[in-house]
Amino acid sequence: MSQALHPALQLLNRTSLVMQIFIGLLAGIALALIAPQAALSVGFVGNVFVSALKAVAPVLVFILVMSSIANHQHGQQTHIRPILLMYLIGTFSAALVAVVASFAFPSSLVLSSQAAELTPPGGIGEVLKTLLLNIVDNPVNALLRGNFIGILAWAIGLGFAFRHASPGSKQLLGDLANGVTAIVKLVIRLAPLGIFGLVAATLAESGFDALLGYLHLLVVLVGCMLLVALVINPALVYWKLRRNPYPLVLTCLRESGITAFFTRSSAANIPVNLQLCQRLGLHEETYSISIPLGATINMAGAAITITVLTMAAVHTLGIAVDLPTALLLSVLASISACGASGVAGGSLLLIPLACSLFGIPNEVAMQVVAIGFIIGIVQDSAETALNSSTDALFTAAACMAEEQRQA
């Protein structure tokens, strides 16, 4: 059968998906430089890819979690608690890194009179209220809106209910999960084309000229994210596994982080992470819950963004910050980051919440948000890559640690 394939298809089958994505990336950059108008046109391909991922992710999570819980065998254990602990420690550590970096390399902003016309949450209570309302959302509405907290709540509830169903019903759920997984694999195979379109259109439309004025701020932001990805996260993985963490860290960055960087959506990257966990041979009943949960609450990148931009505003306005206040900012940024997925605009719109800690007026804070949108081409991409790859990394570390303990 394979001998009947066209030579181009044979080459495609022999080339790894990561290499295909890299080729798509280079092709997108080349097209944007040579023919910007054509590059704008192929942006449609990238939009289709992201839309396909976003479309399949809610259904995948709903079916997979429900099937995993319904088919759970008595005596089996999931390892969610240690993963949640790593999520919380990782997010708080990221906020601390951002505070230290902001003190060491203070950034200044050029604040204009224009502010983004967006409505930030009124306080941490409103963020928590939004999360609670998301939990009790209508299941159909949750699937339509991509509300993964609501999807998880209903999937877990129905999964426990189906534990008492007939073997045939449980088998049907398992078959549905396999069917959706097959569709996801097909969508992920389109990643090289999607990233080609996204990169070409983004560079043709924005370029990097708009970013040069905020180069120092971007270096601090991306530097913090790299430090967390390559130092803090490996330290947490070593704490769990007691062995060299870097092979696993680099695998997650390569397999999950690259795709997340270009899709700029943790939700869209859920299918990629689930497939990565499957390839790593992890415990399905654990990763089917921890990955979508991580896409909602594991927000190390968001904590860095909130902290660095808030500290930049504080430095620009000449506000003195003592150590206790900086620690309080870390806690506030960590809690706010966990609610970033429940706020339209994500981490950037939670900046006014952190700015309020220093008495910065909302008008000024929204100007900082506007700057965040200007640098979003890099900031949002790096943030999503860190967030999403960390979901897979911590899940893998916890599952492997449990396997070592039982061995």
Swiss-Prot record:
Matching Gene3D superfamilies: Sodium:dicarboxylate symporter (1.10.3860.10)
Topology in the lipid bilayer: Multi-pass membrane protein
Principal cellular location given in the protein's record: membrane
Residue spans crossing the bilayer: 16-36, 44-64, 83-103, 142-162, 180-200, 212-232, 301-321, 331-351, 358-378
One GO term (biological process): serine transport
A Gene Ontology cellular-component term: plasma membrane
UniProt xrefs under InterPro entries: Na-dicarboxylate_symporter, Na:dicarbo_symporter_sf, Ser_Thr_transp_SstT
MF GO annotations: neutral L-amino acid:sodium symporter activity
Keywords on record: Amino-acid transport, Cell inner membrane, Cell membrane, Membrane, Symport, Transmembrane, Transmembrane helix, Transport
Domain of life: Bacteria
Keyword Transmembrane: yes
Family as reported in the entry's similarity comment: Belongs to the dicarboxylate/amino acid:cation symporter (DAACS) (TC 2.A.23) family.
Known function: Involved in the import of serine and threonine into the cell, with the concomitant import of sodium (symport system).
NCBIfam families: PRK13628.1
Protein name, UniProt field: Serine/threonine transporter SstT
